[in-house]
């Protein structure tokens, strides 16, 4: 076997292993949100399921976006955005803002109920479980294709409901049930569902 053939074989094995590992990460359930931003006559939104609370004091979140995307550029320029946490009734909204064929600019918001944020002006989705107004504090390159946007949560509002969840590459409505925790004093303590 030549060195170049061996390298190609290793690259194929590495790519296969990377696909397997990506499949395993799909077992991690995540909330689904739409990130929105605007700058004057320009507005954009995108569906994400890569959001996490990074710190409690100050309250900061992290959102992973594709490097060089239109939305990433808009947020870098304006430094503020809205994070709209979707309810289980908003799977069509998630699909819409994930559709690369949707109109660009403000027209993409013609098909959803939204209002302009009173301070920053960016669109916020009216039926979202939570609407968070965020200020970009840091942008960290991740690998070859993504950026981690770190943002401070400035204000927000919310409503009751069930979240839309991404699990194994599909959108789900889930019903949460609390767990019963058995006392730590019992040697056979376990946690079980009610």
Swiss-Prot record:
Its EC number is 1.5.1.38. It comes from the Bacteria. GO terms for molecular function: FMN binding; FMN reductase (NADPH) activity; riboflavin reductase (NADPH) activity. It catalyses: FADH2 + NADP(+) = FAD + NADPH + 2 H(+); FMNH2 + NADP(+) = FMN + NADPH + 2 H(+). Pfam families: Flavin_Reduct. InterPro entries: Flavin_Rdtase-like_dom, NADH-dep_flavin_reductase, Split_barrel_FMN-bd. One of its GO terms (biological process) is antibiotic biosynthetic process. It is an enzyme of class 1 (oxidoreductase). Gene3D superfamilies: Electron Transport, Fmn-binding Protein, Chain A. Keywords: Antibiotic biosynthesis, FAD, Flavoprotein, FMN, NADP, Oxidoreductase. Homodimer. It can form an isobutylamine N-hydroxylase two component enzyme system formed of a flavin reductase component (VlmR) and a monooxygenase component (VlmH). Involved in the biosynthesis of the azoxy antibiotic valanimycin, which has an antitumor activity. Catalyzes the reduction of FAD/FMN to FADH(2)/FMNH(2) which are subsequently used for the hydroxylation of isobutylamine by the isobutylamine N-hydroxylase VlmH. It can reduce either FAD or flavin mononucleotide (FMN) but prefers FAD. The enzyme has a strong preference for NADPH as acceptor. PANTHER family: FLAVIN REDUCTASE, FMN REDUCTASE (NADH) RUTF. Belongs to the non-flavoprotein flavin reductase family. This is NADPH-flavin oxidoreductase.
């Amino acid at each position: 076997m030549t060195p170049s053939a061996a390298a190609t074989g290793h690259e194929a094995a590495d790519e296969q292993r990377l696909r397997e590992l990506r499949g395993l990460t799909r077992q991690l359930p995540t909330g689904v949100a739409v990130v929105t931003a605007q700058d004057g006559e320009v507005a954009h939104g995108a569906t994400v399921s890569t959001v996490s609370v990074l710190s409690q004091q100050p309250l900061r979140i992290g959102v992973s976006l594709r490097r060089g995307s239109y939305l990433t550029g808009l947020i870098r320029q304006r430094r503020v955005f809205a994070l709209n946490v979707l309810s289980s009734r908003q799977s069509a909204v998630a699909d819409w803002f994930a559709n690369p064929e949707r109109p660009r600019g403000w027209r993409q918001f013609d098909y959803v109920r939204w209002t302009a944020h009173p301070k920053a002006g960016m669109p916020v989705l009216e039926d979202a479980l939570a609407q968070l107004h965020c200020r970009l504090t840091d942008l960290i390159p991740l690998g070859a294709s993504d950026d981690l946007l770190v943002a401070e949560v400035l204000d927000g509002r919310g409503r009751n409901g069930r979240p839309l969840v991404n699990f194994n590459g599909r959108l789900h409505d889930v019903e949460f049930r609390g767990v019963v925790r058995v006392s730590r004093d019992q040697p056979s303590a376990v946690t079980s569902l009610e």
